[in-house]
A protein has these predicted regions:
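Conserved N-terminal beta1-alpha1 strand-loop-helix module at the mouth
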Residues: 1-182
Length: 183
């Protein structure tokens, strides 16, 4: 689960990631998160789906839930195609995509781009804040580990961001407070 703050309102948004089966879609349709993520064509993840599989899964998704494609060093053409054909509402770049990749992608689509950053030290957050992506995602690193990073490193952030990694019932309240103190 990921928590996101959006500078346009004071509400907390929820994103559930790693959907790959029809049962997952039925569960998120019932839970009604704001976003759901699909790890696309990243074979080293057991949660990975193909482009064709994500197209089929999204057909069953509640239209109020925005589908996010999670890409790790994917060819730009794959990202563009799934954004342009309406399969995805947002792209999350979770690999080594640099600023030139993000800027070029943004010239081809008006869909929103999320760039994930692994946070180990305060300077990692400063680097994230310089990103031209529409949203930044602050994570412990690697994705899907269930671990948090040191949230005390997060300053007041005046732009939309996702907080990811290890968010559960024991720390959800703290995650929400971090978002309220920022945006």
């Amino acid at each position: 689960m990921q928590k996101m703050t959006d500078g346009n309102d004071s509400g907390t948004k929820i994103k559930i990631c790693g959907l790959r089966r029809r049962e997952d879609i039925l569960a998120v349709n019932e839970a009604k998160p704001d976003y759901c993520g699909f790890i696309i064509e990243f074979p080293s993840s057991f949660r990975s789906v193909t482009a064709d599989e994500v197209r089929e899964l999204v057909k069953e998704l509640d239209p109020e839930i925005r589908p996010v494609g999670v890409f790790v060093n994917a060819p730009m053409e794959l990202v563009r195609t799934l954004l342009d054909d309406g399969t995805l509402a947002l792209a999350q770049l979770h690999g080594q995509e640099d600023e030139s990749y993000i800027r070029e992608l943004k010239t081809y689509t008006d869909k929103l781009i999320i760039k994930a950053f692994s946070i180990k030290i305060a300077e990692d957050i400063e680097k994230a804040l310089q990103s031209s992506a529409d949203y930044i995602l602050l994570d412990q690193g690697g994705g899907g580990t269930g671990k948090t990073f040191d949230w005390s490193l997060i300053p007041e952030i005046q732009r939309p961001f996702f907080l990811a990694g290890g968010i559960g019932t024991s720390n959800l309240g703290q995650a929400i407070q971090i978002g309220r103190a920022s945006c």
